[in-house]
């Protein structure tokens, strides 16, 4: 990849977070290849009849998770604090995601609490300029603590 390709990869990922900040899930998905992989490694939400895990495809699992997060945290936002890329289309991003809970989210009841949580996102952008893979990591225990969900086994 050329310097132009590296710049394009960063631009695509920056546009993704801009769309996320604007709650434009359709735009987030448009920036991804049709078969883009999706991995929210620590993600697991227990529902009444099923468990949603954070692995699959952007257009199925990713889209559902983003819409549900935005619905539960209507002021959800993000701040990109660091971004870097290489000539293979790999982009690493440190981003702080924050929001105030307005509805229950999975097993996390709504206490109206606010969270600020650092995340690491790893993207792979293909030669066509579309995101082919998204992987993200964060501290779920800290997220749940900030939202008042304390569990003792």
Predicted features by range, described:
Residues 1-153:
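C-terminal and inter-domain tail/linker signature
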């Amino acid at each position: 990849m050329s310097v132009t390709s590296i710049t394009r990869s960063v631009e695509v990922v920056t546009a993704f977070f801009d769309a996320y900040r604007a709650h434009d899930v359709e735009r987030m998905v448009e920036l991804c290849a049709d078969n883009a992989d999706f991995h929210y490694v620590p993600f697991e939400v227990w529902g009444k009849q099923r468990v949603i895990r954070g692995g699959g495809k952007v257009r199925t699992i990713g889209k559902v998770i983003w819409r549900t997060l935005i619905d539960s945290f209507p002021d959800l936002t993000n701040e990109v604090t660091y971004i870097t890329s290489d000539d293979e289309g790999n982009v690493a991003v440190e981003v702080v995601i924050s929001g105030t809970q307005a509805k229950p989210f999975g097993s996390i009841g709504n206490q109206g609490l606010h969270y600020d949580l650092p995340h690491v996102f790893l993207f792979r952008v293909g030669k066509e300029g579309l995101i082919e893979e998204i992987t993200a990591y964060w501290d779920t225990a800290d997220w749940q603590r900030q939202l008042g969900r304390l569990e003792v086994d």
